[in-house]
Amino acid sequence: MVKTLVLVRHGVSERGSEDMSRELTRAGQRALSANYPHIFGLLGPEGEEAEIWTSPALRALETAEIVAEALDAEGLEIHDSLYDQDLPALQAELEHADAETLILVGHAPFLGYVAETLLGFELPLTKGAVCAIDVRGSLGHQHECVWKQLGGVREPHGKLLWLVSGPSTQPWETLDALDEACAHAATNLEDAYAEFRAHPEDPAVISAFRFALRGTQLLTKFFSPLLNEEAVKIAEPVYRLMLGATTRLREIDGFSDTVADLMESGELSQGSKLVSAVEAARENERDRVCEALRKKAVRRSLRCALDELFEPAWSDAVLKDGISFEDVSSRFDYMLETIDARLFGLDMTSFSEVHHARREVREVEHILFHLSDMLGEKRANYTQIMQDIDSELSTVCTAQRNISLVKEWKDSMDFRDVTSDLAIVSEHEKVLIERVIEGRETSILR
């Protein structure tokens, strides 16, 4: 004989598909999985022997499976009456039920009507909500009378034991968005790495590879307080290795771009041998980079890092409670405030300070690139501001690196015939730095 009837409305589901095949959203699944062990723990020992009846609709079946997992129960019974909202059929089935605790997983408004009929008052059964009703009847009423109430008897004989509203899916929707951002970053890096291995001679390819690499590194850094510590330890070394291995190649490409600009402006002659000398230096560096990044150990480490991005290992606290939008937005806002403080009064003559500031600006750029939809239009508007600041800082960084390369190459046998052209490049870059310093803005938040 049923003593306790538990009514469960299915969790938040997808929209737009055929009704029977609508699934729970991933956020809906996560919200139920995180909350149901505690909620169904309210049943105490009685929950261990509970029977679970469910509507055949997929969203209800998925909810019932999460209930079963929370109770460590086996087997579900499908009852069409719960989907058809067939009260006489359900009443007949209840009269023959044997379990002392029976759980019904179904839909609104039907479950709400069942609860109201048994209790005499309306219950707010939100999606994922659970209520437990003592259906043994009040003093002087037989058990059978309780089920007859469902057929129209007005006197309510059930007693509400407890009601828990459906859990909010917002923290899990945020987590889903972060999962998607991580997967998008992983796909970008995977594709960029494959393209680099196929076409290492193309400067645009190496630039795209480094952009994807830096993006995944900075996204991992941004999420690091939310991730399992081991996941961060797996990813960071390979990102650092690959960025370090490709840095000089990118610097040579930047120098090559400067030489091309100076030839176009006429500051360097069209027949300058500096072009071929730089190309030779790039070929040597490209071969070194290709050899380093094609090693099996490096590829295996990258694969592990990508796997961590495709399936992020969130911390136990995140898996338990999800992530609020405020967790993400406040962290981003703190980044902006930190960068504004650094840019105000920045010493543009200090290579280390400019380089560090540019890295922080690019961190914001990459976070906006991956999370702009989540962060909203107001924060997304900083994208152009960051790009403008990045352009100025990059101009200075590239010029400073070009000057450093000139100092290195002017004593090299490979550049012995182009020292005068190297001097032209160096002088041009010094003038460029001075111009940027004279015209720069000091704060991004003005």
Question: Model-flagged regions — what are they?
Answer:
Residues 2-80, 122-125:
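Active-site-proximal alpha-helix that buttresses catalytic centers in soluble enzyme cores
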Residues 5, 50, 99-106:
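Generic beta-sheet signal
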Residues 11, 57-61, 108-109, 127, ...:
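Alpha-helix N-cap/helix-start capping motif
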Residues 81-94:
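Short alpha-helix plus adjacent loop in nuclease-associated cores
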Residues 105, 113, 129-130:
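Active-site histidine-anchored catalytic micro-motif
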Residues 121-144, 148-155:
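Domain-level recognition of soluble alpha/beta enzyme cores
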Residues 146-170:
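Short, solvent-exposed aromatic-acidic interface loops
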Residues 165-446:
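Function-determining surface determinants
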